Regions:
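Short, positively charged and aromatic/hydrophobic N-terminal segments
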Residues: 21-24, 30, 35-42
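A conserved mid-domain beta-alpha-beta active-site/ligand-binding segment of alpha/beta enzyme cores
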Residues: 252-281
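Composition-driven detection of intrinsically disordered, low-complexity segments
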Residues: 6-7, 30
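Catalytic alpha-helical scaffold of carbohydrate-active enzymes acting on polysaccharides/glycoconjugates
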Residues: 40-249, 274-297, 303-347
Length: 347
């Protein structure tokens, strides 16, 4: 970043690279042409690549077949390196079981093996529960999961479930390259290459590790031919994200309805979590009588894959399946449908 070029925005002064500003302004003009953006500051650096449209100003969303609530169960199949080439504390893209993170170049066996439980045992237990219920999973995978834990991915493929690209390694977060677009593009490109090699087709969507992306991420994904991103958790409906290569769809993920939040951030019991899941489902289903809504449930095998949590999932799935107007779907299906129908929702 060139400290010699200063751009004033409002009353604050920011030191920014002029080439970067020009690129952002060009991109914002492209977005404005397509999406009529109205709230862009001098640099665009404080503006997200979509319009702020409150749900009260949208037309009713009608899902395929007249369904009311789109329900997506997301299973995150992630991989963590045992050590990193760094003496900085290793953030693994989620809270540890034991606190006080160790340096990245020192093996942290308790936390590593706790996470590995999900790969060795927990994921298979969860697969059984969802297969018995006849419920499809949307499975996100790190590229290293595909390379190092191929049997998990082969099982998902054999069931015809969705696979979503989910970064290269879970602890390598995209914001590490926030000021180096070429490095971020290289990481994403390599992730997508492994996806295509293992899955046998090109990826359609992306979820960033720890949901942490950069200003460049949507543009890089769209230029690579992807149709959706899942990083923005600001809605109960999909919407368009504008890029220089055309729009892609945000299919929202959720931290609120997420096993990490239930069991590790809030120390909830399975009974508490079931009450919260059913409460979320019931209210969204009630609201969806007038406009379609979507609900995402985020799961991690090392969190949810323990024996004492299985009945919790069976009970929730049974509750949801008693409602006929639920669309049990995937992110790719939602994105493909929304790209064709968004004009009847947000004009």
């Amino acid at each position: 970043m060139n400290a010699g070029r200063t751009v004033s925005r409002c009353t604050a002064a920011c030191t920014l690279d002029s080439d970067y500003i020009l690129a952002r302004q060009t991109l914002l003009r492209l977005r404005a042409d397509v999406y009529n953006a109205r709230s862009i500051d001098a640099t665009g650096l404080n503006t997200m690549p979509y319009d702020w449209v409150p749900i009260t100003r949208r037309k009713p969303l009608v899902w395929p077949g007249g369904k009311r609530l789109a329900l997506i169960v997301t299973m995150n199949c992630e991989f963590w390196d045992l050590v990193k080439d760094s003496d900085k504390p290793y953030y693994a893209g989620g809270p540890p079981m034991l606190p006080d993170p160790m340096p990245g170049n020192v093996a942290d066996f308790p936390n590593f093996t706790w996470r590995e439980y999900g790969q060795r045992v927990g994921v298979w237990r969860l697969f059984d529960v969802f297969e018995e219920a006849g419920v499809p999973l949307s499975v996100t995978m790190n590229a290293k999961t595909a390379l190092e834990r191929r049997e998990i991915i082969d099982h998902v493929k054999s069931r015809g479930w969705e696979l979503v690209a989910h970064n290269y390694e879970q602890g390598e977060l995209l914001p590490a390259h926030a000021f180096d677009e070429a490095a971020e593009r290289k990481l994403i490109t390599e992730t997508l290459r492994v996806y295509e090699q293992v899955v046998g087709k090109k990826a359609k969507g992306w979820l960033s590790s720890s949901l942490r992306s950069t200003l460049h991420t949507p543009d890089i994904l769209a230029a690579a031919g992807l149709t959706f991103i899942c990083d923005y958790m600001n809605d109960d409906q999909p919407y368009l994200v504008q890029t220089a290569s055309g729009p892609i769809v945000n299919v929202p993920y959720s931290i609120e309805i997420n096993d990490f939040t239930f069991f590790h951030r809030r120390a909830m019991t399975s009974k508490d979590a079931l009450e919260m899941l059913c409460g979320q489902f019931d209210e969204l289903y009630r609201e969806s009588k007038t406009t379609g809504k979507m609900m995402n449930i985020g799961l991690h095998p090392h969190i949810s894959g323990h024996p004492h949590r299985m009945q919790f999932f069976r009970d929730f799935l049974a509750h949801a399946k008693r409602h006929d107007e639920v669309w049990w779907t995937t992110r790719e299906e939602v994105a493909a449908w929304y790209l064709q129908n968004h004009r009847s929702h947000i004009a």
